[in-house]
């Protein structure tokens, strides 16, 4: 859900309705600006009116990036758009050809944000060999993925393995079984 607040468009990332024992109810929110990517915490009173913003979602395919800008192609009409890196969550996990959802403002038709799938499958290109030692807990080691991202993986993961990575948190989920 996107809202207009303080002359900016925000995406509601988190919200919590609070009804204290004393006093009126309120809603705590975490809002992400769609223009500059900053996340703010805000509290709305129960009677506060909010203007929602109409948005459209379309599927786009990632083509390439040239530093700070990522280029995408609409999978329906093949139109291409360019989006700055600050509008992407975990862009280091996106590989060329990845299909993503681009959210655009219905009124201005400008892109607001890019949503990746919940998880992606990437190949480990370099990691140290795992040595079983005196580990009482789940030991991890850093691994560099095909996109250049570095994530911590369990000791049993080796170079060449494909792993599933959570795109929201940017961490290892499981080994991919082909």
What do these predicted regions represent?
Residues 1-178:
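Acidic-enriched and Gly/Ser
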């Amino acid at each position: 859900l996107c809202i207009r607040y303080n002359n900016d468009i925000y995406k509601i990332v988190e919200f919590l309705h609070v009804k204290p024992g004393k006093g009126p109810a309120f809603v705590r929110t975490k809002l992400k600006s769609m223009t500059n990517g900053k996340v703010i915490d805000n509290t709305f009173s129960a009677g506060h009116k909010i203007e929602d913003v109409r948005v459209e979602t379309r599927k786009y395919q990632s083509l390439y990036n040239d530093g700070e800008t990522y280029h995408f192609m609409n999978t329906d009409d093949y139109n291409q758009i360019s989006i700055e890196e600050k509008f992407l969550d975990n862009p280091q996990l996106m590989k060329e050809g990845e299909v993503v959802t681009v959210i655009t403002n219905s009124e201005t038709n400008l892109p607001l944000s890019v949503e990746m799938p919940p998880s992606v499958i990437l190949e480990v290109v370099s990691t140290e060999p795992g040595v079983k030692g005196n580990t009482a807990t789940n030991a991890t080691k850093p691994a560099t993925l095909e996109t250049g991202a570095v994530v911590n993986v369990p000791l049993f993961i080796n170079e060449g393995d494909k792993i599933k990575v959570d795109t929201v948190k940017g961490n290892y989920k499981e080994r991919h079984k082909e």
